[in-house]
């Protein structure tokens, strides 16, 4: 938190929080005038792109003086913060005004008076048409001014439209406000994405909030200032109806919903939207920017030019009643009705285990009691638990899951642009355009392409990423002996016995992952074969223990950074492959190069296409979905951690030396996999929500706790078991080598420490996992000698 005093300003209570800044209520100690203090945390601005956004916002606001644009009063800087002293808007934002209408009517005297005099249509979530027109006219006034300055805002949404209390008629006219003097005053805020963009110019940066984003931006096409008009149409619709025009959980679904409507916008009868407002909205919400209403047509529309008059002379407040304009709007509500302190803000922290909070649902812990004692005498050092993995881990995970969750999708119909996604893409863009070599430029159309673009396309190419390089991985050594502990040994013995009792896999398969999902009377068996391209770089060097934490300094070499990033990305890639199995079960798509690790995918009998189109039951979707989300969460954590290291290195070195093509290559790879994993996690979450809605409450509430660590451990041990069998049979030794490498990296991922929280694994757990890594590593070394010997004999 910033100091209690910043220059002449005293800092008060926090009233909002965003991805890079916190907002506080404050006042000038000399004039007693209230202000909003936007304190940007310097440590979160880890690359030039984010700093540039702040600089642009400050430079724009310094020169913008308009009654319907939030004013920048002053700027201050301290050791840890940039402070923007802004005009204080005590009625919060438009989103809060709409969604909390009923509670505000009951508790806020001014809002009570506004809705008493201008009531919403019965049973409608929207606003009275006079209030809507008032806000639209004020928004149009601000946009007309921005237009005159060649500015495009690029993030118009209800959360960025702030409200101030109404003023007297005289003050209203003196300040040159637009609209109706006795209604709240709307002002545009948050110019972090704004750019100077002449009418003939085109931009192509993906920014803004998806629910209000123009389709040309969603399609990753170039766009101009008319993209703001689409956002205005979406906002006007939400004011009139109470919900966004195209509810969606992600970019893909949003674009699909927009295209499905074919410019035919539906309005609920209960909303009683006037024809002139319907006509305005339909003119703004045209998919093709060329068909969309122009700015001049918008400014001249009857809704904008209509002169509003009070419906009566009755004042909004009785003469003996006044409101304290220093109180923020949420302070009028009872504390138990404020479900989230950050309800006005676009917040989701996709850093480290914050990803987990964003994606996972609360679940009850239930241990798997399936135990089948057996012994395989051929395998002495690989007897892990496959059903009761890490009891302590499960307990810790359950404790975390019992805490309140922030949805990845805030509320039901609002899509959040995650902080981590912004940071990841910002750094990747910066490195890509920082002159780091021809290879970086070549990757622009390959690795850096966000997954949504491919996924939303009706035609999919199998060569999407054919030019992507795999990360390179340094040599490390496996410790030969790490003594086991009792924490996991019993559970591991039980699981290994159960696993080794299972029949051997088919021949000529390097790695076979068996997914057994039972749905009452049905059992589905999905087999997935990893091909030999998976983690090929890990099989060219000795697989060993991970590096110790790397302290980033200005003298840290590219090679040191690349080695650490490669270590993390290999772990992430191994876990992502497992998550892909779950995703493919819920969304079986033709295989592309992104999922080329899956050579065969089908049911027991198999099909010519390799896919089983039989619909899954809701309970099965729920099981697969929860496991898939948990695995993508782990993937995002590892990729996020890798990007944090790259960000810190770039922050210290960007001014003194460029990133090497190799480092840029790796960062672009991380960006691509991060975006893809996030999109797929959102897709699975949507499927999961739909499945839960179809289930009986009793079915939905009696579930096992899904722990990513258990899933990863189970699969790593199963891969190792199958590899051992194949090795003993002298069957497909190259594939077996790949299997051992895969299992090692999956186990390594479990040992990756979390820098912000207490590790989920205690010392005993870690030592036991290290023992298995050592054991598998030893078998891998022996196998490689055997392969080399065979190769030499073949050459003779």
From Swiss-Prot:
Q: Which domain of life is it from?
A: Eukaryota
Q: How does it sit in the membrane?
A: Peripheral membrane protein
Domain (Protein kinase) ranges: 9-304
Q: What is its main location?
A: cytoplasm
Q: Which keywords belong to this entry?
A: ATP-binding, Autophagy, Cytoplasm, Kinase, Membrane, Nucleotide-binding, Protein transport, Serine/threonine-protein kinase, Transferase, Transport
**A GO MF label:** protein serine kinase activity
GO cellular component terms, alphabetically, are: autophagosome; cytosol; phagophore assembly site membrane
Compartments reported by the entry: Cytoplasm; Preautophagosomal structure membrane
Output the PROSITE patterns linked to this UniProt entry: PROTEIN_KINASE_ATP, PROTEIN_KINASE_DOM, PROTEIN_KINASE_ST
Q: What biological process terms from GO does the record include?
A: autophagosome assembly; autophagy of mitochondrion; filamentous growth; piecemeal microautophagy of the nucleus; protein transport; regulation of autophagy; response to starvation; reticulophagy
Q: How does it assemble?
A: Homodimer. Forms a ternary complex with ATG13 and ATG17.
- Record family assignment: Belongs to the protein kinase superfamily. Ser/Thr protein kinase family. APG1/unc-51/ULK1 subfamily.
- Protein's name in the database: Serine/threonine-protein kinase ATG1
Please spell out the taxonomic lineage of the organism that makes this protein: Eukaryota, Fungi, Dikarya, Ascomycota, Saccharomycotina
Q: Which gene encodes it?
A: ATG1
